[in-house]
């Protein structure tokens, strides 16, 4: 395990989170910053959008920037859904929004360049992580400064990943001991694995507002010799 000062853990400069929430994906909703999600994965199509900038075939993709487009795909084949084309009677990709990048034309066409290799939706070239199927809120309280922040996190994220989310609020967050109800958290475990239960279903069953009770993680500063 690498070390920073006296604190063991991953190098956060190169740390890659595994999960992204739908709200995070929704923030990337412009041609110059274009993400989509489908079939449980998140994809950064910004470079594709730049490559085909000004091309009408990009329009259907730009229209769904920041959204989940799982309904475009057959979950069994992970390919674009297909249908019998009423004009040709052939099996074609189903594109209700109109044909988009890398989808072949309806009829044979001599000016269609098909030398792009794999279509953008096949393979993992554009993949940046997984989509959090379920999220929850967690409060993080810095006991040194009494500052409190509430984060939306994926239920399968480790504490390290939650720490990475928290860095914009406290760039020295890895120099703190993270505790819940007086016990040190295992940074490699999820909230649930650390005993921080998700009680949303219980609140729903009781017809109570779950936002009135959000668990809190307390941060205690360590003098770990890392740069302030």
From Swiss-Prot:
This entry's Gene Ontology molecular function terms read:
metal ion binding
Residue sites binding heme per the record = 52, 83
Spell out the disulfide connections: none
Alphabetical GO CC annotations of the entry are:
cell projection; cytoplasm; cytoskeleton
Give GO BP annotations, semicolon-separated: cilium movement; regulation of cilium beat frequency
In what residue span(s) does the Cytochrome b5 heme-binding domain sit? 17-83
Q: Which residues form a coiled coil?
A: none
Compartment(s) of residence:
Cytoplasm, Cytoskeleton, Cilium axoneme
Q: What does this protein do?
A: Radial spoke stalk protein that binds heme under oxidizing conditions. Required for the coordinated beating of multiple cilia maybe by functioning in a redox signaling pathway.
Q: List, alphabetically, the InterPro entries matched.
A: Cyt_B5-like_heme/steroid-bd, Cyt_B5-like_heme/steroid_sf, Cytochrome_b5_domain
One Pfam family, please name it. Answer: Cyt-b5
Q: Which SUPFAM superfamilies match?
A: Cytochrome b5-like heme/steroid binding domain
Alphabetically sorted, this entry's keywords are: Cell projection, Cytoplasm, Cytoskeleton, Heme, Iron, Metal-binding
Highest taxon listed in the record's lineage: Eukaryota
Q: Which family does it belong to?
A: Belongs to the cytochrome b5 family.
What protein name applies here? Cytochrome b5 domain-containing protein 1
Q: Does the keyword Metal-binding apply?
A: yes
């Amino acid at each position: 395990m690498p070390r920073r000062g006296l604190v063991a853990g991953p190098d956060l400069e190169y740390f890659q989170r595994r999960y992204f929430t739908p709200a995070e994906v929704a923030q990337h909703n412009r041609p110059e910053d274009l993400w989509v999600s489908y079939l449980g994965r998140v994809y950064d199509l910004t470079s594709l959008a730049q490559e085909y900038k000004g091309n009408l075939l990009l329009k259907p993709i730009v229209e769904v920037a920041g959204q989940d487009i799982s309904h475009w795909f057959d979950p069994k084949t992970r390919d674009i859904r297909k249908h019998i084309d009423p004009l040709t009677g052939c099996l074609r990709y189903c594109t209700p929004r109109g044909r988009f990048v890398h989808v072949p034309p309806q009829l044979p066409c001599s000016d269609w360049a098909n030398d792009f290799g794999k279509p953008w939706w096949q393979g993992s070239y554009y993949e940046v992580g997984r989509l959090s199927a379920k999220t929850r809120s967690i409060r993080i309280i810095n006991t040194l400064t009494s500052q409190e922040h509430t984060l939306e996190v994926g239920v399968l994220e480790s504490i390290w990943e939650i720490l990475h989310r928290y860095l914009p609020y406290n760039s020295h967050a890895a120099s703190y001991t993270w505790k819940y109800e007086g016990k040190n958290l295992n940074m490699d475990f999820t909230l649930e694995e650390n005993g921080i239960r998700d009680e949303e279903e219980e609140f729903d069953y009781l017809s109570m507002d779950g936002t009135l009770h959000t668990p809190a993680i307390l941060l205690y500063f360590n003098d770990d010799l890392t740069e302030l």
